[in-house]
Amino acid sequence: MTYQALPDGLFIQNSPIAGQGIFTNKPLEVGTELGISHILDGKDMYRTPLGGFINHSDNPNCEKYRVNMKYYVKVIRSVDPMEELTLKYTFYRV
């Protein structure tokens, strides 16, 4: 298997929200798994490009969830092509 920084169809570009963000060039349906955003390793946490470039929104189209020592991102509402992917950030959690 070849490593991909972002899943097919996702790309990084300047964001109207802040700095740069992650966008899609294809429609994404509810429940689509986008991949790993963070990996826990003891006291350390490593961020992937997916976790590093996804911006905050109070009305996000994605959510993160934890399985063992990894955080994943999935789509929680339909996303149109060229729409930015967003999460609702929390202060004390990844």
Question: Can you say where each PLM-predicted feature lies in the sequence?
Answer:
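Conserved catalytic SET/PR domain of SAM-dependent protein methyltransferases, capturing the structural core
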Residues: 1-94
